[in-house]
Amino acid sequence: SSYVEMNNKVVKLTDELKEKVLNTVNDLNAEGMRVIGVAQKNNIEDIIEFGVKDEKDMVLIGYIAFLDPPKESAAEAIRELIKYGVDVKILTGDNDSVTKKVCKEVGLDVNYILLGNNVDIMSDEELSIAVDETNVFAKLSPLQKSRIIKVLKEKGHVVGFMGDGINDAAALKEADVGISVDTGVDIAKESADIILLEKSLMVLVDGVKEGRSCLL
């Protein structure tokens, strides 16, 4: 956006106002909310068909902030998985502020957050070291998620990945065990090996225990 609406007036989006906008977004992110900016284009009388080229000189009119809280069973499931020796890692496209808040809510200690732009510039050897030292990865693209899982597998880990969105499809396919939920998007469910029908994530713990008992 090039302009912002304030007090029913459209004014230029100056550096000072832009900083205020970003501060508001950061505050909302810190509360675990994802934020979408809403802008409109004024003076459109002469435009018959709209295209990407028209998405400029727009007026910021507000935000949409929405919360996607973790499942109530998430914290207990993570504790139990760790107790059974499962190394729990977060791979997400969300930014680091939202991710920190969610990790705090589920009781997962964050020792370090590795961002997608840093993953991109790492060699496979560097990433191989980083995946052992890092338990939270944020702002990841679908291919970056898949690459991290591939590196973990190459290090000898058996990797399970749980996801329910379009951006999780590649990672679900790459993992040794791809896990989705019955409310996930079609491509995620099609890419998964297992689809959870129960709402409680404790079923993951039950699966680990049952799988190990089969090997005894």
Feature annotation, model-predicted:
Residues S1-I166, K173-E174:
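Cytosolic catalytic headpiece
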Residues E55, E105-V110, I179, E198, ...:
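Short, hinge-like loop/turn segments at secondary-structure boundaries
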Residues E125-S128, K153, K173, T183-L216:
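Non-transmembrane, extramembrane segments of multi-pass ion/lipid transporters
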Residues F137, G178-S180, I194-I195:
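Short, well-ordered beta-strand core segments
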